[in-house]
């Protein structure tokens, strides 16, 4: 599916808001939580219902262990390194539309970790 970065960001925002858009439930309540829950059949223990719970190879960090991302992070992964990454605990949606071919040409784990370092959580007043 082809869409603009803005459209993908809206999709990520819809997931971040548990399927609610402008006060209207577009997805059943709890559906996103279900999508972001580990599927028992996931051999590598990293896949939910159409969402990756960890950055999949070859876009994960070649350094082991890789950078630490929030435990509630999940990812929609597209063709050759396109990502919509959602981190509910940080109220953050990140879209990447780059084209990456080959092994470990894009380290999405490290990119997200650097982004989180650059924008620390806001402390409530």
List the predicted regions and their residue ranges:
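Structured C-terminal helix/loop/strand segments within mature extracytoplasmic catalytic/sensor domains
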Residues: 73-125
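A general structural signal marking secondary-structure boundaries and capping sites
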Residues: 18-19, 39, 119
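Active-site-proximal alpha-helical segments within enzyme catalytic domains
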Residues: 1-20, 82-98
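Active-site Gly/Thr loop motif
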Residues: 37-93
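Non-transmembrane alpha-helical segments in soluble domains
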Residues: 9-16, 32, 36, 52, ...
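Short, conserved, surface-exposed binding loops centered on an aromatic residue
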Residues: 1-3, 24, 41-43
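Stable alpha-helical elements in mature extracytoplasmic
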Residues: 4-8, 31, 111
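Structural helix-adjacent loops and short alpha-helical linkers that scaffold large soluble proteins
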Residues: 19-28, 104-105
């Amino acid at each position: 599916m082809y869409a603009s970065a803005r459209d993908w960001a809206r999709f990520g925002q819809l997931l971040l808001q548990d399927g609610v858009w402008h006060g209207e439930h577009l997805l059943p309540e709890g559906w996103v939580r279900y999508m972001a829950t580990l599927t028992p059949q996931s051999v590598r223990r990293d896949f939910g219902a159409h969402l990756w719970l960890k950055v999949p190879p070859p876009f994960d960090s070649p350094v082991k262990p890789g950078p630490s991302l929030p435990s509630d992070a999940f990812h929609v992964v597209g063709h050759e390194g396109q990502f919509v990454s959602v981190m509910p605990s940080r109220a953050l949606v990140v879209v990447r539309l780059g084209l990456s071919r080959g092994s470990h040409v894009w380290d999405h784990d490290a990119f997200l970790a650097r982004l989180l370092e650059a924008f620390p959580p806001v402390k409530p007043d």
